[in-house]
Amino acid sequence: MKHVLRKEKTLEISATLVLKDGTIFYGKSVGIQGETYGEIVFNTSMTGYQEILTDPSYSNQIITFTYPHIGNVGINKNDCESNVIHAKGLIVRDISSIYSNHRSQMSLLNYLLNQKIIVISNIDTRKLTRILRTTGSQYGYITTKKIHSIINVLKHINILDNPITNKDLVKQVSTKKFYIWKKNVNKQKNNNITNAKLKEKIWHVVVYDFGVKKNILNMLTHRNCYLTVIPADTSAEKVLQILPDGIFLSNGPGDPRSCTYALNAINAFLKINIPIFGICLGHQLLALASGAKIIKMKFGHHGSNHPVKELKSNTVMITSQNHNYTVDTNNLPKNINITHISLFDGSIQGLQRNDKHAFSFQGHPEASPGPHDSMILFDKFIKLMKKSYNSQQKTII
C-alpha cells in the first residue's frame, strides 16, 4: 500500500484557558469556537488518543495530553470506544495537521470539529501538568471569546466545582435501554446452549453500563460470553429474571457514591452469591457495597504506563488507568482482601471478597489503549462463573 501523508488546513483563532486558582494560559483554538467548563485532568499516554477521547469515563472533564504531538495517525472508524466524545474539552501542545496511517480515514482536527469539541493548543502542557500535579485536578474554563472579567469567570468555576451542583454523570452516559452484544458468540440465547465449535458453555453475562467501553464488551465476547447490556439504574429483580451466569460492573465517570441505585442492586447480587467482576467505577462500587469507603485522589491516575503489583504472586503488570477516586485503605471490612496495589502511590488496585464470588480491579484490563498484562482478569471471571455453575449442577444432582 502506498504511504500517503495528508495535511489539513487549519484556521488558528486565539483561545484562553483559566484555572480555578487564577492561572491563565493563552493559546490557539483548533476546534469549534465557544466556551466550556470542566475538571482538568492530565493523561500521560503516548498513543491511543482516539480511544481516550471516546472513553465515557471522561464525561465532564477536560483532557490534557502530556505527550506533545497528538493526531499523527488520524482517526479511523474502528478504534472509538463509544459513539461520541464525552469530554468537555481538550488541551494539547500541538495537534498535527499532517496525519499518516494505513487505517486512518480522517484527521483528528476534522473529527474534533465534527464532534463540536473546544480545543486549545500551543500552550505549555508541561507547566500545566506540573500545576495539576502540585495543586491537584482543578476546574477550568476554555474560551475563544474575549474575557471581560476574570473575577466573573472564577466565580462561575467555583459554582461548578461544588459537589452540590455536580450531576449524576453515570446516567448521562449509560444506555437508556437493554441491548444485546453477541459478537463472535452463538446467536441462540439459552444458558444451556453450548458452542458447537468450541464445545464450551456460552456464558450469559449482564453488563451494567456505567459508561462501558466497546473493547470491554469485545474482551468478554471473545471469551464465549453472550452479553446483555443494561442501564445503570436497572434493579436486581429485573436482572435476575433473565437468568445471568455473572454480573459485570463497568467503568464510568464521576463519584461512585452518587450511584446509590447501583449499590442496592450489587448488594442483592452479593446476597445470592452470583459471580461479579467490577472494573474502574465498578471496582469502587463493589467496594462500597462491601462496606469500604471511597476518597477522591489528588490528581488521579490517567495513563497507560501504571505499574501494579499482584500481591499473591508478587508479579508486576503494566496497566491502563483512568480514575479520580480510590478505595480508602483505612478500616477495610474483614470480608475484603486486597489483591493488587499501585507501585506509584500504594493505592488499592484490586479487591477480592473472601466470602462471595466477587472481585474487582481499578485499572482497565481491556487495554484500549494500553498494555495487555491484566487481560487475564477476564479469564479469572470466566473461571469464577464456571466454578459457580459447576457448584450449582452438583447441588441439582
Curated annotation (Swiss-Prot):
For whether the record's keyword set contains Iron, the answer is no
Catalyzed chemical reaction(s): hydrogencarbonate + L-glutamine + 2 ATP + H2O = carbamoyl phosphate + L-glutamate + 2 ADP + phosphate + 2 H(+)
Residues in Glutamine amidotransferase type-1 domain copies: 204-391
What InterPro entries does its record include? Anth_synth/Amidotransfase, CarbamoylP_synth_ssu, CarbamoylP_synth_ssu_N, CarbP_synth_ssu_N_sf, Class_I_gatase-like, CPSase_GATase1, GATASE
The residues that the entry says bind L-glutamine are: 57, 252, 254, 281, 284, 322, 325
Xref: Gene3D superfamilies: 3.40.50.880, Carbamoyl-phosphate synthase small subunit, N-terminal domain (3.50.30.20)
Q: What keywords sit in the KW lines?
A: Amino-acid biosynthesis, Arginine biosynthesis, ATP-binding, Glutamine amidotransferase, Ligase, Nucleotide-binding, Pyrimidine biosynthesis
Q: Where is the active site?
A: 280, 364, 366
Instruction: Identify the stretch(es) annotated as CPSase.
Output: 1-204
Protein family (similarity comment)? Belongs to the CarA family.
Q: What does this protein do?
A: Small subunit of the glutamine-dependent carbamoyl phosphate synthetase (CPSase). CPSase catalyzes the formation of carbamoyl phosphate from the ammonia moiety of glutamine, carbonate, and phosphate donated by ATP, constituting the first step of 2 biosynthetic pathways, one leading to arginine and/or urea and the other to pyrimidine nucleotides. The small subunit (glutamine amidotransferase) binds and cleaves glutamine to supply the large subunit with the substrate ammonia.
Provide the protein name: Carbamoyl phosphate synthase small chain
* Organism from which the protein derives: Buchnera aphidicola subsp. Baizongia pistaciae (strain Bp)
The organism's taxonomic lineage, starting at the top: Bacteria, Pseudomonadati, Pseudomonadota, Gammaproteobacteria, Enterobacterales
